[in-house]
C-alpha cells in the first residue's frame, strides 16, 4: 500500500498526549498507570486508520486498548477516529512490531490482534510477516498463559502460511473460519480493509490461537 506522506502528522499526534503515547518505552511494565485502572490490555499491531481499534474500545469499555502503527501518516487518521469516538480506554503508539519488547513487560498484554497485515508474498520477505515464528516468539513473551492472538485477513496464502506457522509453533487453534462474514461468529468489528474487500465478494479468513503452555 502506498501511503501519502503527511509532514504534519507527528506534530498533530503530539498535540494529544492523552491519546498518543510518544515514548511508550517509558511505560514498560506500567501501562495500568497510563489507563488508571487494572483492566486487561489488548493491542492491535498494524492499526492502520483505526476503525477496528476505536470500535473495539467503544464496544468494550472494560478493556484497555493500544493501537500500534509504525507509520505516523497513517496513525494520525486513527487519532481522529479516537477523538471522535471519545474512548478513554484507547491509546495509540507509533512503533515497529519488532520493538514491542522495548515497550511492554513480559505477560503485560492480554490479547493481540493482527488484522489484514501486509502479506509480504515474496519468499525472501517471509520473515517480515507478522505471523512468522520470529514474531510469534515476541508475542509469546508478551502474553500471559491464557493470552490469545486473533488474526484476520483476506489473503488466503497468508492465512494458510499462518495456520502452518501457528501449528508448527505448537499453538492451539481455538477458532478457524474460512468465510467469517457467512459464519455464526458474533461481535465482529470490521476494519477499513475488511469493508473494502468483503464488498467485492472476497471471503474473510479468521483464526484465534493461544500458546500451548504447561
From Swiss-Prot:
Entry-linked CDD domains: AdoMet_MTases
Pfam families: Methyltransf_4 (PF02390)
Record: residues binding substrate: 122, 154, 191-194
Keyword match Membrane: no
Catalysed reactions listed for this entry: guanosine(46) in tRNA + S-adenosyl-L-methionine = N(7)-methylguanosine(46) in tRNA + S-adenosyl-L-homocysteine
Stated role: Catalyzes the formation of N(7)-methylguanine at position 46 (m7G46) in tRNA.
HAMAP family listed in its UniProt record: tRNA_methyltr_TrmB
Protein name: tRNA (guanine-N(7)-)-methyltransferase
Species this protein is from: Listeria innocua serovar 6a (strain ATCC BAA-680 / CLIP 11262)
Amino acid at each position: 500500500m502506498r501511503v501519502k506522506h503527511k509532514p504534519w502528522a507527528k506534530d498533530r499526534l503530539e498535540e494529544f498526549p492523552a491519546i498518543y503515547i510518544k515514548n511508550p518505552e517509558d511505560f514498560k511494565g506500567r501501562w495500568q498507570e497510563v489507563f488508571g485502572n487494572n483492566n486487561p490490555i489488548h493491542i492491535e499491531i498494524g492499526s492502520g486508520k483505526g476503525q477496528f481499534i476505536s470500535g473495539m474500545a467503544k464496544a468494550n469499555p472494560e478493556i484497555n486498548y493500544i493501537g500500534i502503527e509504525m507509520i505516523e501518516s497513517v496513525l494520525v487518521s486513527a487519532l481522529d477516529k479516537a477523538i471522535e469516538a471519545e474512548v478513554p480506554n484507547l491509546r495509540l503508539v507509533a512503533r515497529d512490531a519488532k520493538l514491542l519488547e522495548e515497550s511492554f513487560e513480559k505477560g503485560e498484554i492480554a490479547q493481540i490482534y493482527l488484522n489484514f497485515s501486509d502479506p509480504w508474498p515474496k519468499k525472501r520477505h517471509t520473515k517480515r510477516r507478522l505471523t512468522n515464528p520470529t514474531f510469534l516468539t515476541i508475542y509469546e513473551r508478551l502474553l500471559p498463559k491464557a493470552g490469545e492472538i486473533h488474526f484476520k485477513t483476506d489473503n488466503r496464502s497468508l492465512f494458510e502460511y499462518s495456520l502452518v506457522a501457528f501449528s508448527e509453533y505448537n499453538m492451539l487453534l481455538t477458532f478457524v473460519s474460512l468465510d467469517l462474514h457467512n459464519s455464526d461468529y458474533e461481535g465482529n468489528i470490521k476494519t477499513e480493509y475488511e469493508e473494502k474487500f468483503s464488498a467485492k465478494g472476497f471471503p474473510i479468513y479468521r483464526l484465534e490461537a493461544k500458546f500451548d503452555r504447561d
